[in-house]
Amino acid sequence: MLEQPPLSLYIHIPWCIKKCPYCDFNSHQVNGSFEEDKYTNKLYDDFLVELNRLGDKNRELQSIFIGGGTPSLFKGDSFHFLFTRIKSHLKFSGNIEITIEANPGAVDSEKFRAYFDAGINRISLGVQSFDDKYLSKLGRIHTSDDAIKSIEVAKSAGFENINLDIMHGLPEQSIEAAVEDLRIAIEQSPSHISWYQFTIEPNTYFYNYPPKLPSENIQDGIFEKGTKILSTHAFSQYEVSAFAQNSRKSFHNHNYWSFGDYLGIGSGAHGKLTLLNENKLIRTNKPKRPDHYMNHAVDSATQLREI
């Protein structure tokens, strides 16, 4: 017999300033402008379609995650528009977690304040490294100084729940360099660190032109020393790459790992729903290309799969 799990919402923003050579996410480099208003309206249409699939409209949203791409390219008004309308259909839980991913190379203090004012209460900054040498190897558009500034701007905007994405095992990275990245990250007093091992994925530039990676022994040494440092500074590991202070675990990610339900809206977004009245699970998958997503009826373009 199926049980009703917690409900989350994933919103995908597909555009980015520059496609990184290691990125295998559904992201599309901006060439000139992009249709933010049209896309935002389509997200709401998409939400209404998913709402009809939901069945029980009395379920509360426990978390929202805005990923990409680079969601911080969008205005705060766009998210205020969405949240206001979504709230008219689904109740937000009293302690809802609303996360936005942001690129340190696309930081705007007014925009960050607008995100906070719109109800976003958690920000995830894609720092990846505090060493300009490695940032250059990764094709990132920001510098170490930009990364530190983005953290300061987020705090000034009102964010207390801040996640830093940091990679380790970068091309030709030493144990000392990886540990130094963590040390600087911890100095910034984030509430959460996502410490990922760098991997080369198919359909990326690095897959066709692979850089030289650290040996297995070095990578093992990085992980051993890194996890020890994080533990020393009261970061509790609750998933292989996730470390939180003061019970600031990401509810949204935990809901994924716990086989919870999530509505997925936006180009390339995936969703999973438990339909108790039909005793079945369904998965949804939206068109990856933004133009195809915006120019077709959402319901007819959505792929459905029962599991």
Feature names for model-found ranges:
Residues 14-27:
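Local cysteine-cluster metal-coordination motifs and their immediate loop/turn environment
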Residues 9-13:
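Short active-site neighborhood of thiol/selenol oxidoreductases, capturing the structured segment around
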Residues 4-6, 27-53, 59-307:
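C-terminal scaffold of the Radical SAM
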